[in-house]
Regions:
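Hydrophobic "anchor" residues on beta-strands that sit immediately upstream
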Residues: 6-8, 117, 169
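Short, acidic loop-to-helix structural element flanking the phosphoryl-transfer center
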Residues: 59, 77-117, 151, 155
Length: 172
């Protein structure tokens, strides 16, 4: 195993903005359903139930919003609302990457002294798109997109990259 120190970085909301776009999309959705009581809580519960089916990411989020729209309308949601929800999702997928302050300078400096790897969770195509558009790939020796971040996943990534856990630090 390598004795070089390695730093792993999460991507969403560690390197670039992400959660803010989900919040904005949720607010647009709520505008379509102003009659709902506690819409954020209802949406959160539907999302939570659906993670096992759709995983994390924009597509699963939009499918959950579509399901919420059907539930909120007693199975009478109209096609215009469905179209608006799909547009919300497409707008999210087309969003430009907004790096968090000083991220690139920090990665540039750290990459001169440490091996950096990116470990991010979410939908494969969406995460690949964000990673490529970020312009940060040049700082990372490896990029891992996973469906869940748990101890087993980290151990598999470390083993695959020949990294000892004692030489590894995860940020985010």
């Amino acid at each position: 195993m390598s004795n070089k120190q390695i730093i792993g970085f999460d991507a969403d909301d560690t390197l670039w903005e992400n959660e803010v776009f989900f919040h904005q999309a949720q607010m647009k959705f709520i505008e379509l359903h102003p009659h709902i009581k506690d819409p954020e809580e209802v949406i959160f519960q539907i999302e939570k139930e659906n993670i096992k089916f759709y995983g994390y990411g924009i597509k699963g989020f939009i499918l959950s919003l579509l399901e919420a729209s059907v539930r909120f309308s007693n199975n009478k949601t109209d096609f215009q609302n469905i179209d608006k929800i799909i547009k919300i999702g497409k707008d999210m997928l087309a969003q430009t990457i907004q790096l968090l302050p000083e991220v690139e300078e920090t990665l540039r400096h750290l990459s001169e002294h440490y091996m950096l790897i990116m470990i991010t969770k979410g939908d494969l195509l969406d995460q690949q798109r964000k990673v490529e558009k970020s312009g940060l790939l040049k700082y990372f020796s490896s990029t891992e997109i996973v469906s869940e971040k748990d101890e087993q996943t980290y151990l598999e990534i470390l083993e695959k990259n020949n990294i000892s856990p004692k030489d590894f630090l995860m940020v985010g």
